[in-house]
Amino acid sequence: MDSPSHSREARVEKLKKIREQMRKSSHENRKEVVQEHSRMRIDPALERRLERKRMEAEEELAKIETEEEGGDFERRRAWDWTIEESEKWDQRLRKKKQTIQNVAFSDYHSQASKDYNRGIRDLKPDYEKYDKDKKEEKSKSRSVALYDEAERLDWVSNKPDKEHVERLVESIKKQDQRRLKNTKRRGTDEEDHITFINERNRKFNLKLQRFYSKYTKDIKEDLERGTAL
């Protein structure tokens, strides 16, 4: 068992390493900002990313220092941070968590729902043009009462604009690329037989397979031999 002095020395050494990493990270961040500034007069997304990294590093360091002193980090934050700073930081954490949940794969139903909403957002239907065309069709009719959209057949000869078709094709390509990227990240093949309903169930099935595959393999071979006979 480590002595208290040895344990404290280990924590101090860990704290020194973290501070050194922060110093190097800060130096690299400043160097990166200078390079980006000379290239394109500062990228707003880069500034936000670096600011987020800086705040996360400062919070992590404050947690470690507070634990070393035997204090409560939340109480220290309440003393050192203003209400506005604390609320802003909590909001950032919630937004970051929500973004991760939106991007991460949970199950195929939620994935299909996210793809549909993303597709609707990307396609952006032209409601003004739709209303304009509808009014023109109504004006062609002798009576508004005779205008029954359910009985119209002019949609058969309707041809969408070339721009809209290209946008749809581009959207489908992006969906295929995202699906391929997610498939590679999960380590699955699109042609594989799907035996799971979500990522958690897939990992559970793999664990079962590791422990019981030798038994199920024998049973499967026996069944195949019996079927062949």
Curated annotation (Swiss-Prot):
Residues 20-40, 106-142 are annotated as: Disordered. Residues 115-140 have a biased composition (Basic and acidic residues). GO terms for biological process: mRNA cis splicing, via spliceosome. It is found in: Nucleus. The keyword Coiled coil applies. Keywords: Coiled coil, mRNA processing, mRNA splicing, Nucleus, Spliceosome. Disulfide bonds: none annotated. Its main location: nucleus. It holds the Pfam family SYF2. Residues 44-104 form a coiled coil. GO terms for cellular component: catalytic step 2 spliceosome; post-mRNA release spliceosomal complex; Prp19 complex; spliceosomal complex; U2-type prespliceosome. It comes from the Eukaryota. PANTHER family: GCIP-INTERACTING PROTEIN P29 (PTHR13264), PRE-MRNA-SPLICING FACTOR SYF2 (PTHR13264:SF5). Involved in pre-mRNA splicing. Belongs to the SYF2 family. Belongs to the 40S cdc5-associated complex (or cwf complex), a spliceosome sub-complex reminiscent of a late-stage spliceosome composed of the U2, U5 and U6 snRNAs and at least brr2, cdc5, cwf2/prp3, cwf3/syf1, cwf4/syf3, cwf5/ecm2, spp42/cwf6, cwf7/spf27, cwf8, cwf9, cwf10, cwf11, cwf12, prp45/cwf13, cwf14, cwf15, cwf16, cwf17, cwf18, cwf19, cwf20, cwf21, cwf22, cwf23, cwf24, cwf25, cwf26, cyp7/cwf27, cwf28, cwf29/ist3, lea1, msl1, prp5/cwf1, prp10, prp12/sap130, prp17, prp22, sap61, sap62, sap114, sap145, slu7, smb1, smd1, smd3, smf1, smg1 and syf2. This is Pre-mRNA-splicing factor syf2. It comes from Schizosaccharomyces pombe (strain 972 / ATCC 24843) (Fission yeast). The gene is syf2.
